[in-house]
Amino acid sequence: VLALIFAFSVPAQEAHAEEAYLNEDTTMKVTVTNMSPEYSISDVRPITTMFDCEIIMAFKMDEGLCMTFTTSCIGAAKVIGVKDIKVQQKMWYGWKTVLTSDGAESYDSAIFAADLKYADAIKDRTYRVICTHYADLDGYEEVVNDTGAFKFTY
């Protein structure tokens, strides 16, 4: 009797799938934050005043590779910013630097943001972005951020 009740009380499951078509207005955003594989949850972590150090990448058909760099700290830093920016394209022999920037900085601020575009990005090619976030709030700190590889499609 119990098996008969169970057989009738299970609702039917259905799944529907549909192919999404991308158009020129479609934008894919990729956010990468600085995370250290050196520390696990149970480990003691070093004291830091920086957080939300991000590289946001958007691939746009009419603009190329658009990037936003953000750096935040827990109080107003004497100086805060991003430096040593490299946009690299994957080649058969390794990574080729296709764009560099010295970066930018702000003073007496807790948040920094800057934009950068690489208009010559080629569809179906793989790119990565590397930079150094830094801040000086009771001592200078910096962290290197690497997006890893992302394929430019739209």
Label for each model-derived stretch:
Residues 47-87:
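Short, surface-exposed binding/anchoring microloops in extracellular/periplasmic proteins
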Residues 53, 67, 83-85, 114, ...:
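Hydrophobic residues positioned within well-ordered beta-strands of beta-sheet architectures
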Residues 57-61, 118-123, 151-154:
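Extracellular and analogous surface-interaction loops
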Residues 139-154:
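Short beta-strand elements
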